[in-house]
Amino acid sequence: MANPFSKGWKYLMQSLDTKIEENADPHVQIQQATEAARKQHQQISESAARVIGNRNQLEMKMNRLQQDAQKLSDNARTAIQQADKAAAAGDQTKANELNQTAELFASQLVTVEQELDETKQLYAGAEEAARQAQQQQQQSAARLEEQMSQINQLRSQAVSYTHLTLPTSVPV
């Protein structure tokens, strides 16, 4: 009766031999290097896109807040002017209502300006991060191009090597 440990050991050794042969094949190694280089570049590009997208979202938010602040400022100014006209005309009730409206616009303006200041600070950081991410992406693209050039050289060498090692005629 065969020893199960011996059979397992032989199976393991055969499996390892197969793996070594697969990995020793230059074509497999070249393919693995190609996939790894492309995957790394893809990850860097996706990360850069997220960082740049964040910056763009902050820029849009900042623009919207600036427009809101301008609108609230205009509304507060208009309410004050109308309150002054109402007071000059002797309508104190309407003047008080318009002054309260102006105060409401002013308090909203303060809130929007605070949010705008916070967004500007976030945007400054995001802009620097986007610049760095863009540089990293460009460096990654250059690295990928260089790696692909080296990989193409290896492929041509592997093809040459394969042609040299294969027998040209098989004895019969």
Regions found by a protein language model. Name each.
Residues 19-57, 121-122, 126:
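Short, charge-rich amphipathic alpha-helices with coiled-coil/heptad character
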Residues 59-97:
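Extended alpha-helical coiled-coil "stalk/arm" regions
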